[in-house]
Amino acid sequence: MNNIRPKYYAFYNKISEGYYNPLYRKGLNKDTIYEIMVEDGFPTEKNVSFVSIENIFQQINFGSHIAEVFVPGYVKTSYNETTLKHYADMCIIGDIMNFYDINTIRYLIDNGANIKNCGNLLCQASQLGCIDIVKLLVKTSEKEFSGMDDLTRSNKLISTQEIFTDFKNNDHNVCILIAIVYKHIDVVKYFISIGEILSVKDDSLYFKLACDTGCLNIIKYLLEIGFDIESNNNYCLMISTINGRNDIVEYIKSRGVNPNNHVKKCIQIITNHNDDLKSSDIFLMTKFIKTTGVNSNILYQLLLIACEYGYYSMTMYLIKAGIKPTNSCLKIACKNNKFNIVKLITKYPKTRLDINVDNNYCMKQAIFHKNKDMVDYLTNFKYV
């Protein structure tokens, strides 16, 4: 193999035993590495693509497996500086390897893989719970970032990630957020062990995500390091009740929280109304109240409040839950100029509300508020 250039690698995703996407074929390959099965056909990209070992950790997307790629010296190649990928019409494919195996990652590092910008890989390893890979990347980065502690180096690596953009630049450790979402407590504990300090403020995203995903072990751990089980208006109790996570609800109760008392508190909060409250918070409380099994009279009172303040999602939720809107709901919505609610409760199937109720009260309110759209809507209204 005198005429063969240095090794490159191609990524593959394992679909089933012996089948990979793109198609893996050991040996000589000509425009076949990216054959993808679509509707039993095999469309082919123009060229084979692969990445150098130096840039293998800098990719935005990785595969579950990799294979060595050898390119004969007489084969012409091209290079994309944005994707860091090389292209050729022909190459020789070697053995396939599990990319997320610690031995594979160690081998790549030992043979020249650059980890300075491996934020995407660090995040992916956190997502998959590959704690050994996470530790290896942070440890090995000592050569790139000398004089820094483990936490500072890990944050340097994380800052280069491009795949979890929703979590980026929000003063949170992205890898911990990802590990919480995918329920990998070992990854969470590791970053805490190297010095990461999580904010335990009332609206902490860390604790909220743990409750959203319903991982009791992570919830317990976060409480051990200082988080409050009743934070953010008992968010954990409410979302766990809504999601049917009885194990978490029972655990919360064991810590002295009374769900019935919180139901009463939520009803009072919604009834008293506060302009500082977000509609999403009110919607969450409404779902919690409904899930606990309160009687329909209470839910109807909540529907009236939703119509008064224009809470569209809350109104829709209560109607779908079986609380039928009445002419009183319609009048309240018109009085408060909530055209979105007027349209919802008059067009919703089977409501059949009287838009002319109380001597054209709704039209008078629309005119009073100078709401031309509502005037036109009521003028041209036809029952479904």
UniProtKB/Swiss-Prot annotation:
Signal peptide feature range: none
Coiled coil: none
InterPro entries, alphabetized: Ankyrin_rpt, Ankyrin_rpt-contain_sf
Disulfide bond residue pairs: none
ANK repeats: 88-117, 119-146, 171-200, 202-231, 233-261, 298-324, 325-357
Pfam families documented for this protein: Ank_2
Keywords, ordered alphabetically: ANK repeat, Repeat
Protein's UniProt name: Putative ankyrin repeat protein L72
